[in-house]
Amino acid sequence: MKKLNLTDKRNPDYFYSEAIKTLRTNIQLSGQSIKTILITSCYPNEGKSDVVLSLAQEIGSIGKKVLLLDADIRKTAYAGRLGVEEEVKGLSQLLSGQVGLQEVIYSTNFPNMDIIFGGPSAPNPSGLLSENIFKVFLKEIREYYNYILIDTPPIGTVIDAAVIGRCCDGAVFLIEPGNVRYRDAQKAFKQLERSGC
């Protein structure tokens, strides 16, 4: 496993940090069987990836082994956001059989946190994610982590999160106040429920 030094230039305020700690505590209180957690939103640009990164860092800071899995294989952003300049392998390459599991997991300078990047944009993301290989992959890595946080595309715009939800123990659905219509949030939430997550 290759180690990356990631750069996080965000400077969250007290209230944001406390909200992340509350979310972490609620996840812990959900029970030890809740390990694989899908995190999605209704629309793009609601702050989902920031929350996933903050939550992964928070979980790692209390001594729990966490994997941040970027499952947005349509539009990955973590490598650029975290200052990674070298080419990294990712989930899309793993699912399409181009690379093996050990080639996509990167350890980081954040305590107890590993990351799998999304990889190059895939031509048929929901098709790749619905293949049995994704389910087998999650089952295999589950043994090595206390928590796996899966950052998905917004469920209100594409089906990928619902496809991924079939393989998860739980979900966090983020809604940006004032920007998401109630009807759209309800529709997206019902789609997530139908996935069994």
List each model region and its residues:
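P-loop/Walker-type NTP enzyme "switch/lid" segment
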Residues: 2-17, 21, 25-32, 41-46, ...
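Walker A (P-loop) ATP-phosphate-binding motif of ABC ATPase nucleotide-binding domains
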Residues: 36
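Hydrophobic positions on the alpha1 helix immediately C-terminal to the Walker A/P-loop
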Residues: 50-51, 55, 160
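Short phosphate-binding/catalytic loops that engage adenosine nucleotides
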Residues: 64-65, 197
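Conserved catalytic-core segment of NTP-binding enzymes
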Residues: 126-197
